[in-house]
């Protein structure tokens, strides 16, 4: 498999020269400076590619070309934004880039409540605490109708949690949820966030799914024409939040997506950390079922807590994810592709604990150098063992 590393562009404090030392050969990145809904110019793509290749690496995957909210809502300038998305795909293909990751999560990208949760060994991890999230939803955001999503016990626990926070901790919780985590392209004030949430008041899961289908039927033929493989990323966590619908959370959702626009260009990002939050999903079985359409793998593990809706990001080989089984399934698919002439299979260590020098270095939450280096080394070790033992 192709070992890749997410890099956030020239402003990333982790340099391409450092990434090359990790053993990764491919870069996963995007033109983050271009606003959502705008066309990525071919010249800008080519220049970023030249920068990456000058360090002896390859631009392997785009993560992500963001999908504009007008497309998700099926409103406003939806068709204009779809046309721009199509042109961006053409421009990427003209530069030889052939895998594009994207998501269809309304408003929020991936969501956490704590960006530096202490680990027993002294490092820190990302965490989602259901009670903290409920406190934000009920008493900081004050979302209309939120009370119906929580029972009395949950509301009382959320109030008690909030009462235990000083003003700086309350603001930190707000910023963590709405200010945008790495990879998110939109950043909101609390007031603007309320307005954007309200725009989805009449959009349920069925309507959001219809809008996704419309998008797929428009962009998948273009992707197939120019030789790009689209890889949709799952919801994180894989369930509705803040009254917003989510439609990329289960194997059933994935099957619907593949059926909505049947094409080898229509595939998925297999993110074990996102799907793995759900105890109902057998990740190994899912990987085997959809192996042929997995065009990008995010390998990460999570550990569910006493309240199974709460979780923290564990070490890559720990937690609730059968990572050995997942990698075995991916190696099997890689062998099939090598035999049948299929496409390459890039993977990246998705997130990592902040360890050692990471704790004093200004890096993006979840994207440290040493923590991901450790994760990549562990994943490569499992892959090598499976291949050498012909498991």
From Swiss-Prot:
Region (Disordered) location: 334-359
Cofactor: Fe(2+); Mn(2+)
Entry keywords, A to Z: Iron, Lyase, Manganese
GO molecular function terms noted in the UniProt entry: ferrous iron binding; manganese ion binding; mannonate dehydratase activity
EC number(s) stated in the UniProt entry for this protein: 4.2.1.8
Pathway: Carbohydrate metabolism; pentose and glucuronate interconversion
SUPFAM superfamilies the record matches: Xylose isomerase-like (SSF51658)
Domain of life of the native organism: Bacteria
Plastid recorded as keyword: no
Any one biological process term the GO annotation gives: D-glucuronate catabolic process
Recorded catalytic activity of this chain's protein: D-mannonate = 2-dehydro-3-deoxy-D-gluconate + H2O
InterPro entries assigned: Man_deHydtase, Xyl_isomerase-like_sf
TM helices/strands, residue ranges: none
Function: Catalyzes the dehydration of D-mannonate.
UniProt cross-references to PANTHER family, sorted A to Z: MANNONATE DEHYDRATASE
HAMAP family associated with the record: UxuA
Family to which the UniProt record says this protein belongs: Belongs to the mannonate dehydratase family.
Name of the protein in its database record: Mannonate dehydratase
Lineage: Bacteria, Pseudomonadati, Pseudomonadota, Gammaproteobacteria, Oceanospirillales
